Amino acid sequence: MPSLAAIRQERREARLTLLRQGAAAVVASHPNGEVWLFGSLARGDWDAYSDVDLLAIAPDKAKADALADALLDAHLGDDVLALTLERWQRLLGTDEPYWREIRREAIRLDPP
């Protein structure tokens, strides 16, 4: 009988696979877009009530907003933050605790 940790890991991997497939499909119609998962599911400490936190990154604000809307319409994320690529790159270098945590835990879902 598998351990609880093994079952949780298996369920997490299955969920990540579905998110990766969905993100790839959405990004296919949003060129140069990126989708990153952060939060409890990315860290692995999620539970049945955890939401799915995503970053929608694109070259400009209008494209980032459109990507975020598409992710929400596809029911891939509960909270989706739209960022320009320039802002994302700037935030990667910040020492703000919120963004430092995201930088450490984020998982890219779409194929690079």
Residue ranges and their predicted role:
Residues 1-34, 43-49, 58-112:
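Catalytic core of pol beta-like nucleotidyltransferases
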Residues 38-40:
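Glycine-rich beta-strand-to-loop/alpha-helix junction loops that act as flexible
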